[in-house]
C-alpha cells in the first residue's frame, strides 16, 4: 500500500517539499529510493537529510505496507520495539500486543489499541511480504 509522504511522522512542510523536489511524493517511492545503503547515500546528498533519518522514514514506510498499519500503528510498533518488517515477522502476537499497550500507556499514541488477533494478522502479513530494505 502506498500513502502520501506526509503520512510519515516528521515529514511535513519543508521536509515534504524537499522530498517532493526530488520526485518522492509517496511512501512507496520513498521506500524504493531509500531501500539500499547506496540509495540512502544518494538521497542524503540530494536532500541534505541524514542517512539515519532517511532509514527511519523508510522503515516507517515499510511497516505501512502491511494491511491495516497506517501512520499511528507504524509509530506504535516502533515504540514497542519493532523497527522493521523483518522484526515483526518473528514476534509473538500476545507479547507484542502487551508491549504495544505498555508503549501506548507511556506515550499516548493511539486511541484504539489493536487486538491480539489483529496483531497476529499483521505478523502473518509481514511473513508474506518480500523484504525491501537492505542494511549493508
Question: What is the role of each PLM region?
Answer:
Residues 1-136:
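C-terminal extensions
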